[in-house]
Amino acid sequence: MPFLPTAAYSIHLEVALDNIPNTLGRLATAIGEAGANIISMGGFDVRGELLVNDVVVNCRDEDHAAAVVAAVEGLSGVQLLHWHDRTFNMHEGGKIEVVSLAKVDDRHDLSMAYTPGVARVCMAIHENPALSHELTIRKNTVAVVTDGTAVLGLGDIGPAAAMPVMEGKALLFKEFAGVDAFPICLDVSDPQEIIDTVIRIAPTFGGINLEDIAAPAAFEVEEALREALDIPVFHDDQHGTAVVVLAALWNSCRLTGRQIGDLSVVIAGMGAAGVAVGRILLGAGVGSIVGVDRSGAVYSGRDNLNSAKAWFADHTNPDRKMGTLAEVLVGTDVFIGLSGPGLIDAANLRTMNPEPFVFAMANPEPEIRPEEADGLAAVMATGRSDYPNQINNVLAFPGIFRGALDVGAMDITENMKLAAARAIADSVSDEDLTSTFVVPSVFDKLVPYRVAEAVAAAAVADGVCRA
C-alpha cells in the first residue's frame, strides 16, 4: 500500500503563469494527476502578462517530489521560478536559539547581570549549592542527551545526524511546556562514557532527558544516572511511550466498559519501550502480559535474555507461554506493537478475542495498517500523525518535566508516571471519547499543564522534592 502525501515531504513552488484562462487550472490538474496534494496557494502577483503564484504541495517521498517538479516544468504557459523542500528549509540554521531574559541597557544593568554584582550570586550558590536551582538556568533547563545509536527508525546514525531530532525535542519542550532544553549529542562508543559525561555536565541542568540510546545500554545509562544525580533523569523512549500507551489503554477500557485488570496483553518488541510499557502496565494492574522478541515469547529461564528482558520475564508471563507472536496472540485482548512493519495481519487479529485493542506503533510503517484492522479492532492506534489515535510522546514528556521542575523533584518515580498517564487519559471527556479519539490531540494546550500539575502532586506525595 503506497504512502499518502505528507507534510514531511512538502515542497514550495514559485511559478509564473500566463495570465490567461485555465492556466492555473492546468497547473492544479497536473499536480493532482501526479498524485500530490495542493495544501495552499497564495502570493498572487500580476506582473504584466504573467501571474506569479506560490503553491505548497505535499508529496509521498523525495522521488515523488522530483516527479511533481518535472510535471510542473513540462507545462506550457507555466514557468517554475524556484522551488524548495520545506522540511529542509525549516531546518536551515537549526530550529532553536538562546534568548536573553535579562536586559542590559545601561551600566547599572551590566553591573548586576555581570561583574561585579554577579559575584554576590556566585558566592551565595557556593555557600548553598541548592540555590543554583533558583538563581540560574537550572530552574527551567533540561539536557536532551543522545549518542545517536537508535534514532527514530533510522538506527545507529551517529551524534551529528541525530542533532535535528534532538533540536526538535528541545523545540517541543519549549513550545508545549515552556521548558528550556538544549541538545547534547555525544560522540562516544561506550555507555560508561555517556554516564561519565552527563555527570560532569549535570551542574548546568535541572533535568536530563535521555533520547535515542539503543537498548540495552539505555537501561544501564538511565539506572546509573538516576543513582548518581539529584535531578530527574528520564529516558523518553521508554517512559514517555509507556505513559501514553497506558493513557490510551485506560480510555479504551472506559470506552468499552472493560476493566484493565482483566485484559490479556501481548507486547511485540522488547527494546527500551517494550520493557517500559510492560513495567507501567504491571503498575496499573494488568495481570496477563506476554512479551515477544525475535526469538519468540519471553519467559523466565529462556536463553538469550539481557538484564532488562530477564527482569521482564521474571515479572510477566506467569503461565510461561512459549512460541511465536502468532501463537501467543491467540485468545488475547490487546496487541501493543513496538517492533517493525507488517508484523501481523487481519488473520492474526481474528485469532484474538473479539474486538481487541490494537496499538501498532512502529514508524513509519506500523505492524498492521488501520485499513487492515478496520472492522476487527475496537480501538486502533498508531504512532503516525496521519491516522487517528496517535500514540505520541509529546503528550507526556513536556508536562512531566514541567511538573518535576516546578516542585524541584530529584527523581521521576513510577507514581509520577502513573499520574501523568491518568492526566492524559482524563483530558478526553466522556463526550469526546470515541474509538478514534482515545488520546487527546497533541495540540491541546491544556494537556501539558494538566500533566504537570498531576506529576508535581505525585512528586510531593512521594517525597522526592528538594527541601
Region annotations inferred by a language model:
Residues 80-83, 183, 209-212, 233-236, ...:
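General beta-strand structural signal in soluble alpha/beta enzymes
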Residues 152, 159-177, 229, 235, ...:
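Glycine-rich phosphate/diphosphate-binding loop of Rossmann-like nucleotide-binding domains
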Residues 232, 236-237, 258-262, 360-467:
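Adenosine-phosphate binding glycine-rich loop
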Residues 310-379, 384-386:
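Rossmann-like adenosine-cofactor binding region
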